[in-house]
C-alpha cells in the first residue's frame, strides 16, 4: 500500500450545501492511499454578517472550520458507498438566524459520516452524504448579535449534525 499518489488517486471537491448555509466557502482535498482508503483535509470559511448594524435583523453564521480525516470505500476509492471519520476544529460566531441569541466560541472533536459517490464522468463525481460530530466547546452566549450582553459562558460537551453533503468532486 504505497503512500504516493498517482492517477485517479487525488481529488478536490466543494460542498454545494455549504454555500446554501449563508454563503460558506469550502474546499476539500483527498488522496488515495490504497484501494479502499483515502485521506481528506478540508476547510470552510464564512466571514459574512447580514444586516449588520440593525439589531432586529442582524444574523451571522461566521466560522472557520478545519478537518483532517479518513474515508473507507468498500468497493474502490471515489466510487460507491463510503464511511468517514475526522478530527475537526471550529472557531464560530452564529446568531440572529432563528432567535436573537448569539453564541461564539471554539469547538473541537470527532465526526462520523457516510455517503455515496455517483460517478457522472471519468473525472467528476457527485457525492451525497451526512455526518455528525461531537466534542468539547468553550463558548459565550449573548442576548443578541450586536448588544454584547452576556447571558452564559463556559465549556461543555456537544453532539450535533455536522454536514449535509451534496458535493462536486474532480478526480485527477
Q: What are these model-derived regions, one by one?
A:
Residues 9-12, 51-53, 95-98, 147-153:
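Extracytoplasmic loops and strand-loop junctions of Gram-negative outer membrane beta-barrel proteins
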Residues 3-5, 30, 74-76, 157:
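Sterically constrained small-residue positions within well-ordered secondary structures
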Residues 31-128, 167-170:
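Gram-negative (and chloroplast) outer-membrane scaffold detector with strong preference
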Residues 1-9, 172:
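Cleavable N-terminal export/targeting peptides
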Amino acid at each position: 500500500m504505497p503512500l504516493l499518489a498517482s492517477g485517479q488517486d487525488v481529488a478536490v471537491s466543494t460542498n454545494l450545501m455549504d454555500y446554501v448555509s449563508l454563503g460558506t466557502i469550502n474546499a476539500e482535498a483527498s488522496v488515495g492511499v490504497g484501494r479502499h482508503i483515502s485521506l481528506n483535509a478540508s476547510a470552510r470559511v464564512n466571514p459574512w454578517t447580514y444586516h449588520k448594524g440593525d439589531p432586529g435583523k442582524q444574523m451571522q453564521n461566521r466560522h472557520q472550520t478545519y478537518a483532517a480525516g479518513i474515508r473507507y470505500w468498500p468497493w474502490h476509492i471515489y466510487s460507491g458507498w463510503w464511511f468517514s471519520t475526522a478530527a475537526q476544529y471550529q472557531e464560530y460566531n452564529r446568531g440572529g438566524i432563528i432567535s436573537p441569541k448569539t453564541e461564539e466560541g471554539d469547538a473541537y472533536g470527532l465526526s462520523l459520516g457516510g455517503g455515496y459517490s455517483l460517478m457522472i464522468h471519468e473525472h467528476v463525481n457527485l457525492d451525497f452524504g451526512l455526518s455528525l460530530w461531537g466534542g468539547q466547546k468553550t463558548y459565550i452566549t449573548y442576548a443578541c448579535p450586536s448588544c454584547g450582553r452576556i447571558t452564559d459562558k463556559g465549556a461543555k460537551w456537544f453532539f450535533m449534525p455536522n454536514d449535509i453533503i451534496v458535493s462536486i468532486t474532480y478526480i485527477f
